[in-house]
Amino acid sequence: MKRLACVLLALTVTLSGVIVLRTVRFTSRQITVPPAGEMRVDTAALLDRLANAIQFRTISSLDPARAANEEFERFHEFLSEAFPQVRTQLKREIIGGHSLLYSWPGRDRALKPVLLMAHMDVVPAVDGGWRHAPFSGAIADGYVWGRGAMDDKSSLMAILEAVEHLLRDGFVPARTIYLAFGHDEEVGGHRGAAKIAQLLRARDVQLEFVLDEGLNVVDGIIPGITAPVALVGIAEKGYVSLRLAVETAGGHSSVPPARTAIGIISRALHRLETTRFRSRLSGPTRRMFEFLGPEMNWLNKLALANLWLFAPFIKKQMAQSPLTNAAIRTTLAPTLFHAGVADNVLPANASAVVNLRLLPGDTIAAVVAQVRRVISEPRIKITPLPLQMEASPVSEVATPGFELIQRTTHQIVPEALLAPALLVAATDSRHYAGLTKNIFRFLPITVGPEDTRRYHGTDERIAARDYERLVRFYAQLIRNAEP
């Protein structure tokens, strides 16, 4: 017994030593950089042009015939008038009907180009519930309001403002800069970004990196961190929706069978909602902990420095919040349900749609197979809907592209920490995977807990200070891209 106690004590001391040593070696990944150079801008004019851009109802649709074609054409004309230097000095191509590709030739053709992305299309918006009408572009209370203020006309306009400013200053980049603006990102990007990427591949273009919209500077959202955090997406989740359908005899509601069509589908949905996909601390989430863990208090730092031991506890904690749960597993959510024609008629048919967002490492085939196993109901027909996207590859952080974004962010948003992370939504950037391994998703505007609902929701807005800073960010990024 005494010998066993000595062995246990030795193991405890050794384990404690390993934990403490790993924690001590868990040092900061933040960097110190000189401040950005001065950039004089006319803030009122910047805001006015963004407000005007928001007024165009550039709503995309899966059906090209229903897209706002005239609005996109009018928006193109507006951009040409608003940015005369861009119009005269950059080559512009219209791709896939309404998407735009600008080419800004660099001095050194041996350097790989950089591609900056945004999209001009927006999701629909109803007038009710908005403080300012969704397509008013109102400038009020220190914000620009309207659909597209956050997603994603602010990014598009800020890129063009930055390039226009640099052109006026006579700046010529060392490497070629591409500006790619899709017109159907909200419905998959297959006629816009996909066509642009196809064109660049045909021209044998290989990119140094791609920067698209994505994660933001979050404030008050990450537990254990009081400072703002700039989250740079290094991967995004996959996407697939499944239609679950069943056919029965139907009949009169006074003589129901043991299992009705609605009951069969409802039972399947209950099984799916109560059977979660396996949780994993995947590459992007681990990288985020590597960058943020050293900035936390000792206990949090100790846990994150020793994921080999504390990963189960951390995953359990993350699973408590929908926001963090989405970062550790493939998620499933019922989004549509169709059944019934009257209150006294048993519907012969019932169907539902469930939307899945795939964690990197999971595949569409694998998650569909798991859905079948969980439902375990041969009467239900499971059909994947056409819009499908596998999870993206994970971009590395030890690359010039990520380091450039990190350096620029610390120059423009010096009060923020920075960390790579997983984007749980989908962007047009995935279409460029064949042109570079370095794809990043980051829009440096500040988002608090109350702002997350504004994406695709009511009262979408961007702070005037954030928009001016966004213009400075893109201008500094282009300058920093010099070798």
Residue ranges and their predicted role:
Residues 1-13:
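N-terminal Sec-pathway targeting helices
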Residues 12-147, 168-173, 354:
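Acidic/His- and Gly-rich active-site-bordering loop/insert found
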Residues 25-33, 200-209, 216-227, 232-241, ...:
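Acidic-enriched catalytic cores of C-N bond-cleaving enzymes acting on peptides and small amides
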Residues 41, 92, 103, 109-110, ...:
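An extended, acidic, His-containing surface patch that forms the Zn2+-binding/catalytic region
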Residues 51, 55-59, 80-88, 161-168, ...:
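Sec-exported extracytoplasmic/periplasmic mature domains
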Residues 51-65, 245-248, 383-390:
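Acidic/histidine-rich, surface-exposed loop or edge segments in extracytoplasmic proteins
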Residues 143-144, 148-231:
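Acidic/histidine-rich catalytic neighborhood of metal-dependent amide-processing enzymes
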